[in-house]
Design a protein with these regions (language model features):
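PTP/DSP superfamily signal
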Residues: 2-17, 21-77, 152, 158, ...
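Beta-strand-turn-beta hairpins that frame and shape the catalytic cleft
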Residues: 89-96, 148
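Short, acidic/polar
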Residues: 103-113
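Structural motif corresponding to alpha-helix initiation and N-cap regions
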Residues: 104-105, 136, 164
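Acidic beta-strand-to-loop metal/phosphate-binding motif
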Residues: 119-127
């Protein structure tokens, strides 16, 4: 059994490939030659594979094996993360992209030049980045060079309580970045299938006049994944209910806060926007 004490945790790509039932999102795979030029090929899904610069090297296979074993033991879901395939992402809306961690500065070049990204919202903790041997300072430096604003709102991976508590601040940062209308926002965690889609779904739920299931289905039909819906419902409850005698969330039915009244949405939006200065 893998030693999970040293592993960061993250949701990952399904072993059986990505499918959306009858709909197949268009895949674009990018390659980068030694002189930095790119080639691309399309196959038919919303997933984009940017293979300019995977950091997988010696021991990378073992790291992925340990990581995926830990993930299956802790989360019992069908997903796996293949770091060796490079950064991957899906365009969710005209201004919102959800994906995996950038691995090299070349990935930042791609996001800027090919996807017109102006903001990157990173949900990883330091240990998540260090585990994969990514030169984080080089990533941040390239963002600065290209005029991309890099924002961090870390949450503990595979921890629904951490996700619940961090969603309001992460969504606040995302809503602010989108409101600036300067370019797309790239939201990522490690694999882009847990924390990052949860933040994107929550943003659509709270700010795009959708119920939770509609927002959840919209994103997962484009990028198949399994973000924690209960954590989103709990974060919604935390913001919408300020009565000190309110019934604990844990006592509510499973469907509670999958939808909200207009006044609750307005209250949530006010509270989330107030976190910009927090």
């Amino acid at each position: 059994m893998a030693n999970t004490s040293r592993l960061p945790t993250s949701c990952v790509i399904p072993t059986g490939g990505i499918s959306t039932g009858s709909r197949r999102p268009a895949v674009v795979a990018f390659g980068c030659s030694t002189d930095g030029s790119r080639g691309s090929r399309r196959s038919g899904v919303g997933l984009v594979l940017c293979r300019s610069s995977s950091t997988a090297g010696a021991g990378g296979g073992r790291k992925m094996e340990d990581y995926n074993t830990a993930m299956k033991n802790m989360m019992r879901n069908p997903y796996e993360y293949h770091h060796d395939l490079g950064m991957n992402y899906a365009v969710i809306t005209d201004n919102l992209i959800v994906g995996s961690q950038p691995q090299k500065p070349e990935d930042i070049n791609h996001l800027k030049n090919e996807e017109k990204v102006a903001y990157i919202l990173c949900l990883q903790q330091d240990k998540d980045i260090e585990y994969w041997g990514i030169d984080f300072q080089a990533i941040v430096s390239r963002c600065k060079d290209l005029g991309i604003q890099h924002i961090r709102r870390p949450a503990v991976d595979f921890d629904p309580d951490s996700l619940r508590s961090q969603l309001p601040k992460a969504v606040s940062a995302l809503e602010w970045a989108i409101s600036q209308c300067k370019g797309r926002v790239y939201v990522h965690c490690t694999a882009g299938l847990g924390r990052a889609p949860a933040v994107a779904i929550t943003y659509m739920y709270w700010f795009n006049n959708m119920d939770l299931n509609t927002a959840y289905d919209k994103l997962t039909s484009i990028r198949p994944c399994g973000p924690n819906k209960r954590a989103i419902r709990a974060a919604t409850y935390d913001l919408a209910k300020n009565d000190p005698w309110k019934e604990p969330f844990e006592n509510l039915p499973e469907h509670a806060f999958e939808g909200i009244a207009d006044w609750e949405r307005k209250l949530i939006q006010e509270r989330v926007r107030a976190l910009r200065e927090a």
